[in-house]
Amino acid sequence: MSECSASTSQLSTFCVNEIPWKLVPQTCDEFSEYEFIDEKYRRLSDVESFVWKWSPCGRYGIDLPGGRDVINQQLRDRMAVFDLHTNKWTLYTMDRGAFEIPRVCFLYWARNDIIGTITLVKDYEAGPDDEIPLKFKQSFFYVSHETQTLVYSGSCKYRTNKTIVASYWYHIFENRRGEPFIDHNNYLWLVFSNGVDSLILLPFIPTSTCFKAKCVSFDMNDIVSQFTGIRVFLDPFVSSHYVPWVYRNDVNFFIRIDSHSFIEEQNRDYGLDPQIDNPETKPHRGVFQLRVNLKDVIEKGEKDAIHAVNPETIETRFNRGDIELWRKISDELRQEHQSIAQHGKMVVVQRWSHFTVDMGLSKKMRTRVADLDARDYCCSHKPRNSSFCCIDLDSERIKAVDALILGTDVVLPHPSGSVFLFRYKENYGMSYCELPFFQPLSLKLKCIQVLKESVEIDPSYYRIKCCLKMQEELEKETAENLCTINIQQ
């Protein structure tokens, strides 16, 4: 097990206003019938805008229109598909198996032309504090780009003995591309969490030898307490409900520890910050990466079960000794949100302040909206912490980026190694740019975009560049005048 910190990470700085933004035309019709979750259950998250799940070839992105909190009745049988070659997104129609409200699922590409979905099967409408049994339905759809349809191909169900609290069950479907976990038998699995103490493994594609769900238990409070040397009581919601981020045989968690994490839940007052100046807990507050080799854990659990008198009583579990990496990747997030996206070995941990999203206006405009004051403050606020960081799960290298981003911006890694920043406006209007300091898109793809006449640069980019140029020339002229005055004196 290695224990290190992110203090040696690279810090790159740029302003997104200085990058050419590509406009993305909206090709679908206008829809107006929406149903909103009650304010008290509302969770602000980056799925209120599109978080594209890229196909293995990298050309297509797919997501559900509407997100978790904004439900469009007329879009229950459709999915949004973004074509990088034409820089357009449209709605593909599903021929059957339409989702019911709340229309939430986990999306992943099983193949270049097959989409898989995982939904939670609820037998009854539970109260916010009820425990829901974790029963899943897995469905597959063939993607026809010629007819812009998703053809239903089959489904199956999985039952477990685990439960999840009803008020946040949908957080098990966080925005991951669906990286498959590879076990000791070379079977592929999708990994989810019940948000408290268990991982649930579902077959990536069910076969005759891989068709049942598996469970792995853990006690995150105990594990983290052993690393910090101080007893902690983690808030699962703040730590993204222990969502597992998979890469090959490993599972990564990104754990947030704040000043409230050292107080038992029943004694917390979230209106106060009791230990902000406590020097004893300060080194242990922040965002930490924890990595466990799940392949070895499962293999050991299965071997123990084989030699047990009652195999069904043996519980596969990981603990402190199974952790291969524990490190701090950023300081404590204060009054900030955190969202995570992944593709392959690249994970983007994004942070943004509460004030940059206008919740009332967001409801009215059907997607997250930042008002002008928030944009102005965000672009002039100094000093700033890094807006996001990219973590290479293979080399463990961290690249921190201060990019002046807002809560309405979504940072997404692409299969090519590029990183995109999508900016959303009302009615899913959007533009995007390729971020510097990362691998650029291939020349072949850029040529395809030019030949298809799909590259349209946002005209506001040129206005901004002109303003910046004028400001630069004015500052230069002022400096020269001051220099001349000093010489004359």
UniProtKB/Swiss-Prot annotation:
Question: Which controlled-vocabulary keywords does the entry list?
Answer: Developmental protein, Ubl conjugation pathway
Its domain of life?
Answer: Eukaryota
The reply to whether Oxidoreductase figures as a keyword in the UniProt entry is no
| Keyword Magnesium listed | no
Q: In which pathway does it act?
A: Protein modification; protein ubiquitination
Q: Which GO terms describe its biological process?
A: embryo development ending in birth or egg hatching; protein ubiquitination; ubiquitin-dependent protein catabolic process
Q: What does this protein do?
A: Probable substrate recognition component of a CBC (Cul2-ElonginB-ElonginC) E3 ubiquitin-protein ligase complex which mediates the ubiquitination and subsequent proteasomal degradation of target proteins. Ensures germline precursor cell asymmetry by targeting germline proteins for destruction if expressed in non-germline cells. This process also requires elc-1, cul-2, rbx-1 and ubc-2.
Query: How does this polypeptide assemble, per the annotation?
Result: Probable component of the CBC(zif-1) E3 ubiquitin-protein ligase complex formed of cul-2, elc-1, rbx-1 and zif-1. Interacts with pie-1, pos-1, mex-1, mex-5, mex-6 and elc-1.
Q: What is this protein called?
A: Zinc finger-interacting factor 1
| Species whose genome carries this gene | Caenorhabditis elegans
Q: What gene is this protein a product of?
A: zif-1
